[in-house]
Amino acid sequence: MPTRILVADDHAIFREGLKQVIGSTVDMTVVDEAINGQELLNKVQTNDYDLVILDISMPGRNGLDVLVEMKNIRPKLPVLVMSMHPEEQYALRAYKSGASGYLTKGSPSNELLEALQKISLGKKYVSSALAESLVNGLSDTSQQDLLHSLSNREYQVMSLIASGKPVGKIATELTLSVKTVSTYRAHILRKLNMKNNAELTRFVIENKLL
């Protein structure tokens, strides 16, 4: 029986692309879709799937927080996280949140199928690029500790601020109020011992988090 896959992504074109790639195999099939975190949680709670492909950048709730909640509902359900963010930026957090694998959306189709095959067997998938990054690591363990102090949402907001997006645009993108984003920003600066966005951006760039 083919591996039954649910694809959670808010972009229809990307979902269709995944369906075509996965449809080229005989042992895997996309049986359902979700366009946001809440829909994903609802479907996982009421239906049985063999594997989930999750975009962590969907509107609304932070994708990694959704992943944690989903694993609480279905602890044994394997999840492949796919994102536009570089592996160095989110992969470790994804694994710690319960993911079985992490790929960027620019990964070739053969690597996607390899990851899905391995994950469907109950194993973890780590790309060669991520493995190299893990070996190199951050040069300063104190900086790693600072990053670990951030929540998933704070980490996401930090990345968006460092990319040059204003608070208003970040609020719209994450479906949050400007006040909430400003509060996250204040928490981030305090936890990282920084005074302004310029220092934050420099920190992110120096540690190759963007």
Q: Which residues does each predicted region cover?
A:
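Helix-turn-helix DNA-binding segment
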Residues: 144-179
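Active-site beta3 strand of CheY-like receiver
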Residues: 47-53
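Acidic catalytic/metal-coordinating carboxylates
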Residues: 36-39, 62-65
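Basic, Lys/Arg-enriched C-terminal extension of HTH/homeodomain DNA-binding domains
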Residues: 189-210
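Receiver (REC) domain active-site loop signature in two-component systems and cognate sites
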Residues: 56-58
